[in-house]
Structure formats: structure tokens, C-alpha cells
Amino acid sequence: MAQLPPGDIATMPNQKVVFNAPFDNKATYYVRVINPGTNRIGFAFKTTKPKRINMNPPNGVLGPKESVNVAISCDAFDPSSEDTKGDRVTVEWCNTPDPAAAAFKLEWFQGDGMVRRKNLPIEYNV
């Protein structure tokens, strides 16, 4: 039996993550991840700047029609001395092999199963 591809997810906001100056304190931006589909999914966040950008929770499981708010935090930094071009967070998701899975498992993303990605560029308003 062929594996079903993961359905779409929705994020709010849909296009990008925005952090506003000043950048001398930690700032947090919330992204809602929504599973509008009919299958349980596992999701995981990644970033191009793991020393500056953190996500909480960084991964999880969403049942059909469920959602979660993910806190994306940016540690204090000096934008004049650091390259911010290309900064982004990426959410990856896949169908869970077990429709009743309640806990995230990294192995879902390490096999040959289908994984989808959505990139959210980070914009820094100086």
C-alpha cells in the first residue's frame, strides 16, 4: 500500500516572522500551526540561526483539525554586526505512522517517508 502524502498545514501568520527593533532584549513572536487535514501529523521546526532563534515547542503532534501556538524567540543581538539575510524558520511535517501517536518521534523524519516543508523568512525591522 502506498503511503499517503501529508496534507497541507496552515500557519498564522502565513508568510513571514517579524521581529522589531530594538534588538537589545530577547523578543518572542507567536506562530499558530494548524492541521486542517484528516490525518494526525508530526511537526518539527528548524532555523538557519540556531544560536539566536529558538522555538517552543520545537516539535509535536497534531490531530486532525488541531492547532498549537509556537513561541519563536530571538535572542538579543547587534543587527549592524551580524548578517541577517536568509534568516528563516522552517516547519516540516509528516503523517504519523500510528494514527493514535501522541508523542513526537524524530525517526518519522529520518526514514524514506514523505516530509513536507514550509519556509517562513524572518524579517528584522531596524
From Swiss-Prot:
UniProt keyword annotations, A-Z: Acetylation, Cell projection, Cytoplasm, Cytoskeleton
Pfam families attached to this UniProt entry: Motile_Sperm
Organism domain of life: Eukaryota
The keyword Transmembrane helix appears for this protein: no
Modified residues (N-acetylalanine): 2
Tissue specificity statement from the Swiss-Prot or TrEMBL entry: Sperm.
Coiled-coil ranges (or none): none
Record InterPro entries: Ig-like_fold (IPR013783), MSP_dom (IPR000535), Nematode_MSP (IPR051155), PapD-like_sf (IPR008962)
Subcellular location: Cell projection, Pseudopodium; Cytoplasm, Cytoskeleton
Function noted in UniProt: Central component in molecular interactions underlying sperm crawling. Forms an extensive filament system that extends from sperm villipoda, along the leading edge of the pseudopod.
Protein name: Major sperm protein 2
The species this protein was found in: Globodera rostochiensis (Golden nematode worm)
